[in-house]
Amino acid sequence: MKLSRRSFMKANAVAAAAAAAGLSVPGVARAVVGQQEAIKWDKAPCRFCGTGCGVLVGTQQGRVVACQGDPDAPVNRGLNCIKGYFLPKIMYGKDRLTQPMLRMKDGSYHKDGEFTPVSWEQAFDVMEEKFKTALKEKGPEAIGMFGSGQWTIWEGYAAAKLFKAGFRSNNIDPNARHCMASAVVGFMRTFGMDEPMGCYDDIEQADAFVLWGSNMAEMHPILWSRITNRRLSDPNVKVAVLSTFQHRSFELADNGIVFTPQSDLVILNYIANYIIQNNAVNQDFFTKHVNLRKGATDIGYGLRPTHPLEKAAKNPGSDASEPMSFDEYKAFVAEYTLDKTAEMTGVPKDQLEQLAQLYADPNKRVISYWTMGFNQHTRGVWANNLVYNLHLLTGKISQPGCGPFSLTGQPSACGTAREVGTFSHRLPADMVVTNEKHRDICEKHWQIPAGTIPAKVGLHAVAQDRALKDGKLNVYWVMCNNNMQAGPNINEDRMPGWRDPRNFIIVSDPYPTVSALSADLILPTAMWVEKEGAYGNAERRTQFWRQQIKAPGEAKSDLWQLVQFSRRFKTEEVWPEALLAQKPELRGKTLYDVLFATPAVSKFPLSELKEDQLNDESRELGFYLQKGLFEEYAWFGRGHGHDLAPFDDYHNARGLRWPVVEGKETQWRYSEGNDPYVKAGEGYKFYGKPDGKAVIFALPFEPAAESPDNEYDLWLSTGRVLEHWHTGSMTRRVPELHRAFPEAVVFIHPLDAKARDLRRGDKVKVSSRRGEVISIVETRGRNRPPQGLVYMPFFDAAQLVNNLTLDATDPLSKETDFKKCAVKLAKV
């Protein structure tokens, strides 16, 4: 049957999504129209992925009752994915938390006690005692926080400021460490600045799309609908999809490539070799704008230093590199021939050549997209660097319709985790804690004593787990994530660390997640439009929303929790005498006074809020807290290539892409005529680097940390499905989404199932060297692994897939490889 462009788009973007949830979209529309007069509408960005779709939120009698795509939103143009259509229902799960819960026994806190409702005063009393004891006995390195790419911008900023400036601890890291850290380090190594240079407008102008380890059809369906539209509008447009298994994005692919896990590094170097051998290097661009460097190799796998793989590594964790000539680089990639690449990857030669030709053709505008397949990789930084190489060799970058683009999975992994600087090594606007000048800039702007911010990099996500188990990290606050389910290797470090009597764990969450139920204190959290917020999406678009309803019961926003808790500490209790001597006027003041009630933050009066505008935090404090924090934070980037617009501009717009200079947003960075930081006559300028040149890195293939063997004979790759988001803590509480995909399954090749006497629907035990999970065999459906590999989603709290995964990380980014470990199957 011939499928028209119109019917294909409709089927993929609307009908299929609605059918998956068992709901008629026209029925939803009729219900909304029928109540329109009684519903109040306001804009907000979607709560889910990093695409940053705009939605219109309908509220009635203090509840969110409807949601629709915002037709004025440039990202999604009125279209939602199936999760977006059900946004209202994520707010109202039957088990929504509405008051603090503390483990208690005989009337007081006990590690093995039962969760008991307490007041916020009681909750903060216990937290205060635990924090002060740890700080007094062990110092700032004994406390830590694990935050989120789902924090609003000012929540992340407040958390980073409280920990790094207030408690003097860099032991704060976001869950974006698990998803975007490799992209960050890749950007910084190649360009000296974080985040993509292009934008979503590239889609309508591209001639070819290459997906590296990205199932956009399910993980970024709105962007996929735009790619689909472009592909079906022009027969000359091509789509290539690379993955370790077939998935829904392959349905549109002209060239669907399944490769052996880890061998994407080989393919990337082969394409670079092909470009050079076919004289496709853009010599003018290359000569003017590119440097070449050879990176250190044999850098280990981010495991504990005692692990045999770390002991065997020659350069564990090394980020070193040295200059090299073009001839040396040419010789380096020449090793990656077509024959060798086909042999190492398992990809047919004709498919490899077709892929390379897309990049080599000077008349093809190519966009490379990637997500977790690249980033959750023990050489994820290298993979990012190597794809940049292809665009830098050909000059296909920083222009409409072509460029490398790292997609994000969380709504503010860019705007909060990265730009704000909530990583353990970062400060706002790409500054880092190890740079004395950067620390000085922050300390002066925050008006705190010189030397307040520690120079030592704090514990990253996996290191926090290890420090908890080792008894070195004793008070741990987890906000806006479900890391007990989402993080790697649950059994060996995280669970023992959380339940260690030496440690006190706080989890702030709207629901009783696996993490919350593993903690000692649960704090009920306001979510989405129950607070005023701001997110930054994958294309550098910053979007604001207003508080539209009140949170249920005693639930409070993460911002409220951070700011109110800061009142519990006086400077003398957290800062040494040497610091206080520099600023004696700060003696006797609380951290709230010196961090959040300063003239810079508190200068915006409540009169700037409309009379009927909800804003619980600001009205309680007596000033416009969110505006004060945002303007203080935005100062760091203005004039330095990270320019954010004035606060009020965002409430009047559907988002703006930074740098925003003189009221104009930037679509394409680093190119003349598009970027205000590139002067006339410069052509291109990668101004994150001192000489304005980007870097091509020579980096080889290196094997995975763990591969199948005779005992554990299958690769395991983990990930998501369309209907659920991450650990399912929100989407599984939406009945329609839960019905559409009620439990996790093991996607397996039919021949692998047959060889193990397994049939579709059978219960199966999946085991690794670290743990086991009971799941269900699936030999059909959307994901079709090759022989030798199984795929499991991690949304199901009843099947903790991360009991299986290895906590190997990229040694440079410290990001976990969730895509490669060895497992075996046994029929139950």
Curated annotation (Swiss-Prot):
InterPro entries on file: Asp_de-COase-like_dom_sf, CT_Nitrate-R-NapA-like, MoPterin_dinucl-bd_dom, Mopterin_OxRdtase, Mopterin_OxRdtase_4Fe-4S_dom, MopterinOxRdtase_cofactor_BS, Periplasm_NO3_reductase_lsu, Prok_molybdopt-oxidoreductase
Ligand binding ([4Fe-4S] cluster): C46, C49, C53, C81
HAMAP family, sorted: Nitrate_reduct_NapA (MF_01630)
Protein name: Periplasmic nitrate reductase
Signal peptide: 1-31
Uppermost EC category: oxidoreductase
Cofactor mode of binding and number, as noted: Binds 1 [4Fe-4S] cluster.
Binding-site list for substrate: F794
Keywords tagged on the record: 4Fe-4S, Electron transport, Iron, Iron-sulfur, Metal-binding, Molybdenum, Nitrate assimilation, Oxidoreductase, Periplasm, Signal, Transport
Cofactor requirements of the protein: [4Fe-4S] cluster; Mo-bis(molybdopterin guanine dinucleotide)
Compartment(s) where it occurs, according to its Swiss-Prot or TrEMBL record: Periplasm
Residues annotated to bind Mo-bis(molybdopterin guanine dinucleotide): 83, 150, 175, 179, 212-219, 243-247, 262-264, 372, 376, 482, 508-509, 531, 558, 718-727, 802, 819
4Fe-4S Mo/W bis-MGD-type domain boundaries: 39-95
Enzyme Commission number: 1.9.6.1
Family: Belongs to the prokaryotic molybdopterin-containing oxidoreductase family. NasA/NapA/NarB subfamily.
Quaternary organization: Component of the periplasmic nitrate reductase NapAB complex composed of NapA and NapB.
GO cellular component assignments: membrane; nitrate reductase complex; periplasmic space
GO BP terms in the entry: cellular respiration; Mo-molybdopterin cofactor biosynthetic process; nitrate assimilation
Gene Ontology molecular-function annotations: 4 iron, 4 sulfur cluster binding; electron transfer activity; iron ion binding; molybdenum ion binding; molybdopterin cofactor binding; nitrate reductase (cytochrome) activity
Keyword Mitochondrion: no
Role summary: Catalytic subunit of the periplasmic nitrate reductase complex NapAB. Receives electrons from NapB and catalyzes the reduction of nitrate to nitrite.
Ranges that cross the membrane: none
Species of origin: Salmonella paratyphi B (strain ATCC BAA-1250 / SPB7)
Catalyzed reactions: 2 Fe(II)-[cytochrome] + nitrate + 2 H(+) = 2 Fe(III)-[cytochrome] + nitrite + H2O
PTM characteristics: Predicted to be exported by the Tat system. The position of the signal peptide cleavage has not been experimentally proven.
